[in-house]
Amino acid sequence: MLHLTKPQKETIYMKITRVLLAALFLVTPLMFFTDLTENPFQVQNTVLYVLLALIYATMAVKFLRSKTIDFTKTFFDLAFFVYVIVCAVTWLSAVSSEPQALRQTMFYNMLNYGTLLLVVALGAYVVSKNVVFSGVIESKTNYILLFIVWGALWLLLPYLHTMLSADNLFARMFDWYAVLLWAAGIWLGMRVLKKVTQENIIVLVFISVFLACVYGVLQALGLEFLWPFEMSQFASKAFSTFGNPNFLSSAVVMLLPAIAVYFLRAESKKDMLVYGFLTLVYLLYLSFGLARSCWLGAACGFIMMWMFGSLRSLVWGRRLRAFLLILLAFGVLYGSAYFGGSKSPVAARAEELSQVTPSNFTLDVDKDHIFQSLHQRLFMWDVSKEIFLSRPVMGAGLGNFQMAFAQNQYKTLLKHPNLRELKARTNAPHNEVFFQLAQGGIVGVGLFLFMFMVLFLEVKDFASHKKEGDKKQLLQAVFCGILGMLVDNMLNISLHAVVPAFIFWWFVGAEVSGVGKEDRTVAITVNPVTKTVGLAVLAFCGAVIVWQGLVLCSYFRGYEGLKLQASGQVKEAQANYARALALYPANTEAGLRLGNTYLQEHDYKNALTAYEKTLSAAAYYDEVYFNAALAALGAGEEEKAVRYLTEHLKLSPFNLRAYVMLGSLIRQDVIYANDDNLKLLDRGVHLFPYAAELWTTLGDIYVKRDETEFAKNLYKRGLTADTLDRTLLQNLKRLYKKTQEELPPIAAQAQRIQDLHVKAANYWSQSVSGRRKLRTDIEAYIKDFPNDTNGPVLLALYFNQAGNALKSKELLEGVLKEHPEDLSANLALSSLLYRAEQTQDAVYYLKSALFYYPENLTATKRLAALGKK
């Protein structure tokens, strides 16, 4: 936008810009409230958006007043701007192809997620590429030491904390002591940025990330001092001020190569000690953060440093210093893994990688061998592939990944039912290439890869032709940080978190302006067109500030409602939820909770209104659809209940209760029995073959529709799945009697085993010879029908009553080895183990039964009874 290097006579616009830049790089990463919003980093997001908007507003006013402005033109601009434009086009393409009901949701998708690219990424890049590299690394260690003192002063906050009496957002955020500290910090930041150069901005980033790392290390050691009450749920976790250890770890990955260059080029012992200390703290936090993808990213960044000849010669020239740092780094990393004489979470986290083997690197995995970190990612990548296949050219559209993920994950779940508990709502799949493929299709991922290929080639050319020096080595280190971040985001989502994404795109802008040809500027003067653009930028900045204010107030009110609800003040909670939803309709959690409170009070109409308002902004939220169906049912609106249940089951295919409810509604009024709904119910009996009520309900629907043959086939399928279901057998007999046809073989088979089951249940009333005959008959049945698991289960029951628990257990384990979803076998084996006082194993099989049949009454009651003992 303009060269931001401080001129000889500083203008008011430059002063304002320096203040905003100091706040942007210092306040944003460190401002952290856990008692304002449920998502602790929501305040950070708002502050960053507002500060970026203010910087652009300042530049726009400067342009309108001074009548001229200079843009720095770089080799990267065309590729990046084309990528941004194409992303916007993908959103328009998606909107035009989706039904009207989804378009409001897609608008909020753009606000929630699309603006990360359009505001944060683009905004950071454009400002950054207009800040120059001076070519000189100045000593700023005095300021770093002052900032360490400044950070230590925050230890006094719990003792000097003040709070205004009013109960609003401003009063909760305001604190006189904190205001003084922030003012002092921004003033120090302005001193660091006395010359606004990339080198000085990098130092300011060093400082803020270092202070965040120190706080995170203290948290990991259990020394929480700022938020002792609100942070209790984060005990021994290094969340720091980024709200997520992965996000701060990603920032560390980007900074490690650069701070290594500062350390190696330090001319004084003081500089060497300070930068060395910062490096060790970064490494310590990286270890405590437990983010393995960041460990990989950092390793790749360091390996890339060794690939550059100038950095290699720098390391070799300062090899004694480098060796000492490496030695200390290994000591720090080893100490973090084995401090206190025992293995820490760091070592345990590293050892978990041994669970990743070629045999389980697949989605076809048994539920007991699911490795969460691995299979959650494999699952999300497979869903991303499904999104891409549904729209291969333009993808789901900018900002629409979360919606598309919710709409497509059922495909993967149905192919791999053992992964049902990995079902998720996410805005990124922990792999940036899959994200770009799903969001932008072939066009989007192609432009994304091309964009960074252009950067990599330019860096290669720069490394080959430029002379040695501070600028060259620092730019190569920044590039290594960018590469490390990209590697990290092959398994992480920090590029979709506001603060690390901002730092990343700032570094990209810095790298682009540094390695490209110098003095390539475009002067723009005021004319009717450019003036209109300037005014539009100013209006857009104002809109961003207002929007972010509404978002923050909404999430504040939503969190207040949650705390009031937890304390039993339901009416006050409802008022806060309603205000939150009115301020920002895309606050889906507030809308869901508002509806839930009304639903608990049996106020079905208000509950339905709240749910429907929430769905208008989040038409992919399966839980809201289900609860809306309950509310509609209570309000007597069966048509809406059916519609919401069908939408829910499209998104969440393993909700047995929803299938049963839908079937009951359709049985009551077969007008709702269209092909789509019948297909859903048929899918339900396929997924839950032991759900007798579901088979019966669907059969009754076919009978009511005079589709007797469909009903017959359904009952036969049901009996094939569970030959012990008496209701299905009776219904099948009744239909065949009505049509005077001969009963099918499955009926005779079911009657045979049901008769045997009655005899087995009356085992103790039979004679010895009768018991022997019963065993012979059961074994004959198993021989005749080896694929029916009810045979071995019944034989296991016989042996258990005969006192041979070992044989009974062997039979049941054999059934479950081949058919782990068998409900009868799971329940029978849990009872057997409980009587053998093997409670832990009994609990396992009860949980297994509930995994395949959620809310099964027998398993739920037994598990609850075991939990009390």
Residue ranges and their predicted role:
Residues 224-239, 343-383, 387-389, 398-438:
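Interfacial juxtamembrane loops and adjacent helix segments
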Residues 554-557, 588-589, 604, 621-623, ...:
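Helix-start (N-cap) detector for alpha-helical repeat units in TPR-like alpha-solenoids
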Residues 566, 600, 634, 668-669, ...:
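Register position in tetratricopeptide repeats
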